[in-house]
């Protein structure tokens, strides 16, 4: 089953600027946005990217439903420029990236994204990189504290790093639940928010180089767009949104972009009731003004 896309109407309104055209879905995921766009705009085609193996499998299973209008590439969206070149595509009419972890990824206990996972992996692409388990069990106090603060904006980053090093003296921290226990020994719950939320976010972002990948995509996007083409980014926390906002502002000041969203666009209350995952979603969009 394909996931429920976040703010599909708003996304399509900002992404599709003219009839027809070729678009890039940088984060295919469960195919929700792609299917919505293909159904709403019968004359567009999409090049879809995702580095998650599960996403690749879902596309293959239901490829016929896309009627030959989607080309799927299993790769990190930081490589969009190179991948499009390999397909002899020099320009596209829009670029969409939904920078979030899906409910399916959170629900898969073998992935390590949730607090109850039986593993501390957290890699989006298991072919590459290192697991969060390696970070937690081998990084220094200073490095752990910096990661938790930089990527999770965790105010108790140093206390948590100290608690992790103390726990490591008793043995390896193998599971997400074990790590959560360590964090909860330092930090108390704040309302409904799990005390481990920011540390888990920080580890996931660090392991997958999420902010660096986003920066590369944003840097390459103007060169890949036709005049009038649009970049639409859906982010879920302030770190990502800040990078997008600053990039759009710089390109706007240089005359490369016209910003379409003067303020971030958020989900309506009605959508949040149906899809709680949309609560923290924020859309920013910009249109290329120069060739």
From Swiss-Prot:
GO terms for biological process: rRNA base methylation. S-adenosyl-L-methionine binds at residues 31-33, 50, 77, 98, 105. Gene3D superfamilies: Putative methyltransferase TM0872, insert domain, Vaccinia Virus protein VP39. Specifically methylates the N4 position of cytidine in position 1402 (C1402) of 16S rRNA. This is Ribosomal RNA small subunit methyltransferase H. It catalyses: cytidine(1402) in 16S rRNA + S-adenosyl-L-methionine = N(4)-methylcytidine(1402) in 16S rRNA + S-adenosyl-L-homocysteine + H(+). The gene is rsmH. It is found in: Cytoplasm. One of its GO terms (molecular function) is rRNA (cytosine-N4-)-methyltransferase activity. Its main location: cytoplasm. One of its GO terms (cellular component) is cytoplasm. It comes from Endomicrobium trichonymphae. The keyword Lipid biosynthesis does not apply. Pfam families: Methyltransf_5. Its EC number is 2.1.1.199. Belongs to the methyltransferase superfamily. RsmH family. Keywords: Cytoplasm, Methyltransferase, rRNA processing, S-adenosyl-L-methionine, Transferase.
């Amino acid at each position: 089953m394909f996931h429920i896309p976040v703010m599909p109407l708003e996304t399509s309104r900002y992404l599709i600027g003219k009839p027809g055209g070729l678009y890039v879905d940088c984060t295919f995921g469960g195919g929700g946005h792609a299917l919505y766009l293909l159904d709403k705009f019968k004359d567009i085609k999409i090049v879809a990217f995702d580095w998650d193996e599960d996403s690749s499998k879902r596309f293959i299973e239901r490829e016929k439903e896309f009627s030959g209008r989607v080309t799927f590439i299993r790769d990190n969206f930081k490589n969009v420029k190179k991948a499009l070149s390999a397909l002899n595509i020099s320009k596209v009419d829009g670029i969409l990236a939904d920078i979030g972890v899906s409910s399916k990824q959170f629900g898969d206990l073998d992935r390590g994204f949730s607090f109850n996972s039986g593993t501390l992996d957290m890699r989006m692409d298991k072919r590459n990189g290192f697991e969060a388990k390696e970070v937690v069990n081998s990084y220094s106090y200073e490095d752990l504290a910096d990661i938790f603060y930089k990527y999770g904006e965790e105010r108790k980053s140093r206390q948590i790093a100290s608690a992790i090093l103390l726990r490591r003296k008793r043995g390896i921290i193998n599971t997400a639940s074990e790590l959560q226990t360590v964090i909860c020994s330092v930090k108390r719950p704040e309302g409904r928010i799990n005390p481990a939320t920011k540390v888990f976010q920080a580890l996931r972002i660090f392991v997958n180089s999420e902010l660096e990948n986003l920066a590369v995509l944003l840097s390459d996007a103007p060169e890949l767009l036709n005049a009038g083409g649009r970049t639409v980014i859906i982010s879920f926390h302030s770190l990502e949104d800040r990078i997008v906002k600053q990039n759009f502002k710089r390109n706007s000041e240089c005359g490369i972009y016209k910003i379409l969203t003067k303020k971030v666009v958020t989900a309506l209350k009605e959508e949040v009731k149906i899809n709680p995952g949309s609560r923290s979603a924020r859309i920013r969009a910009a249109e290329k003004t120069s060739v």
